[in-house]
């Protein structure tokens, strides 16, 4: 699509924003992710059957109580916007050139320029496929309680520091380099240093951190060894953000505008900066590599297993897929006392349109997609494939047995046995 076609699509998918509840969420979904080595947009890679950007949108929607949302698209704009889809209180904007996260935020803020809004702005990367509404809600509560002008959500990197490619949180140490105590300044977030900027330093090159009239010095290895990382999730008071966005510069190794530089800028202008640490750092990680994406998928599977392990029988905790919609329906059955005898064997995959009933057993490597209703007491043998197109339904009655290797497709009804 050409630029005009993309803008036309963006306008078509966008809706008017209602800013009355005091907050707006911005999703940064313009990047592509070269290191993922895929023609598909980074934002469209799936975690547990759902594109990451769609998961981020749902987390913001729940965590911010249905606040207005602005999605910044860029590379693969058409595919990303269509994946998110049209919805109330949702607007798309385009970052035509990849000039950094700071530029993306500036473009998003232009969408509410002139609007009667003086609330809070929340920013989340579009590739954070494990983040949930509870994490967003907790972050929002921390920000509102803190009375800060800006807050960053941080995580703790548990692996080898050499593999940590996140920006590092630089806090004021307890004692400065000359041994003098930092006093009340100790622990304050002084700035964020991006990973690529750290790598570009010479090994023993000193880096001076100036914070509220004090100076302390770190070198390259000091910063690489920091385990607290920037998740890319931020909260701002709208007025403070607007006031200082124009202060961002491209004086860094990537020649981009960094949102992270606002930490230092806010501190220099006597704005109150806080950080909140995520309860589970795994949920606030993004991805740049296929291996990381697989690790995130494994975490998503583990979370589903932990939810269901005492509700139904899952034969192999490492090899199954039950879509979020199926999980929700299982909990509905459980509330009615009808989920206990559901048995899911190794390698089973159940798509979002699958409806189970009490006493259903689904054997190894069955795959069910489309709209499918499985009656009570039914047994699906190994490698059964059931699928249909949109608008079609497959209904399998109670106490039915489908033998190994059978395929059922289309509009089908199998009566009770």
Feature locations, PLM:
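Conserved core of the sugar-phosphate nucleotidyltransferase
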Residues: 131-249, 253
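Conserved adenylation A10 loop of the ANL superfamily
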Residues: 29-35
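Conserved catalytic-core motifs of eukaryotic protein kinase domains, centered on the activation segment
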Residues: 36-40
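Left-handed beta-helix
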Residues: 1-20, 251-417
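Conserved beta-strand segments of alpha/beta enzyme cores
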Residues: 43, 89-91, 188-191, 272-274
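A structural signal for short hydrophobic beta-strand segments in well-ordered beta-sheet cores
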Residues: 44, 168-171, 275
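A residue-level structural signature of the nucleotidyltransferase/glycosyltransferase Rossmann-like core
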Residues: 121, 128, 233-234, 285
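Conserved N-terminal catalytic core of the sugar/cofactor nucleotidyltransferase
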Residues: 1-27, 50-141, 145
């Amino acid at each position: 699509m050409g630029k005009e076609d993309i803008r036309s699509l963006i306008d078509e998918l966008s809706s008017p924003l209602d800013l009355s509840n005091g907050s707006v969420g911005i999703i940064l979904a313009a990047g592509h992710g070269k290191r993922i080595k895929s023609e598909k947009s980074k934002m469209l890679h799936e975690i547990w059957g759902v594109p990451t950007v769609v998961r981020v949108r749902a987390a913001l929607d729940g965590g911010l109580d249905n606040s207005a949302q602005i999605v910044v698209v860029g590379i693969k704009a058409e595919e990303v916007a269509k994946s998110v889809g049209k919805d109330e209180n949702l607007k798309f904007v385009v970052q035509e050139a990849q000039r950094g996260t700071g530029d993306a935020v500036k473009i998003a803020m232009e969408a509410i320029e002139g609007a009667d809004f003086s609330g809070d702005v929340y920013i989340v990367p579009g590739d954070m496929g494990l983040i949930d509404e509870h994490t967003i809600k907790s972050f929002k509560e921390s920000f509102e309680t803190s009375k800060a002008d800006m807050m960053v959500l941080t995580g703790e990197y548990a692996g080898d520091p050499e593999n940590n490619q996140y920006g590092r949180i630089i806090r004021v140490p307890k004692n400065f380099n000359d041994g003098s105590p930092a006093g009340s300044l100790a622990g304050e977030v002084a700035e964020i240093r991006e990973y690529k900027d750290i790598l570009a330093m010479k090994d023993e090159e000193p880096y001076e951190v100036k914070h509220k009239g004090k100076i302390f010095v770190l070198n390259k290895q000091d910063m690489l060894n920091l385990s607290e990382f920037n998740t890319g999730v931020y909260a701002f008071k709208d007025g403070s953000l607007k006031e200082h966005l124009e202060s961002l510069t491209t004086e860094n190794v990537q020649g981009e505008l960094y949102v992270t530089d606002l930490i230092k800028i806010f501190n220099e202008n006597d704005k109150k900066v806080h950080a909140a640490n995520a309860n589970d750092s795994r949920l606030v990680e993004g991805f740049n590599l296929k291996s990381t994406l697989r690790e995130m998928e494994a975490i998503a599977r583990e979370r589903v297993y932990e939810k269901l392990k005492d509700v139904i029988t899952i034969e192999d905790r490492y090899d199954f897929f039950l879509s979020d919609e199926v999980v929700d329906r299982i909990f509905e059955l459980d509330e009615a006392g009808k989920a206990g005898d559901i048995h899911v064997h190794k390698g089973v995959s159940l798509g979002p349109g699958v409806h189970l009933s009490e006493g259903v057993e689904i054997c190894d490597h069955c795959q069910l997609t489309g709209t499918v209703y499985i009656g009570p007491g039914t047994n699906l043998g190994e490698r059964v494939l059931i699928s249909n197109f949109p608008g079609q339904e497959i209904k399998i009655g109670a106490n039915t047995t489908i033998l190994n290797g059978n395929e059922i497709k289309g509009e089908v009804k199998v009566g009770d046995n």
